[in-house]
Amino acid sequence: MADPTLLILASLALGDKHGYAMMVDIQAFANVELGPGTLYGAITRLEQRGFIRPIAGGDRRRPYHLTAAGKRYLEEELARLESVVRVGLGRLRRA
């Protein structure tokens, strides 16, 4: 169960990337394969929310940049997930 939104934002937290580079990075750090439809659908939604923005470039690959709003959202969601993991692991240990 992997949220493509968080995976894309986490990938861009390390620096600007185009779609294919994001797919490779996400596969490497999360062991999750995002198909092009899933990736580019999520990219469109992230752009609409102002969390990422495309960078003008000369070649046909369009790199994306994590905005300040996207960074804030990623930080908040990762903190929330960290809390969920902590609670979940604690409950498993008691079971």
Where are these regions (language model features)?
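N-terminal helix-turn-helix DNA-binding core of bacterial DNA-binding proteins
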Residues: 1-38, 58
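Beta-hairpin "wing" of winged helix-turn-helix
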Residues: 47-58, 65
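Basic amphipathic alpha-helical segments that dock to polyanions
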Residues: 39-41, 45-46
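Conserved anionic group-binding/transfer micro-motifs
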Residues: 22, 70, 81
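Amphipathic alpha-helical dimerization/coiled-coil segments
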Residues: 75-95
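Basic, amphipathic "hinge/linker" alpha-helix immediately C-terminal to the N-terminal HTH DNA-binding motif
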Residues: 59-78
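Histidine kinase transmitter module recognition
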Residues: 11-14, 55, 73, 77-80
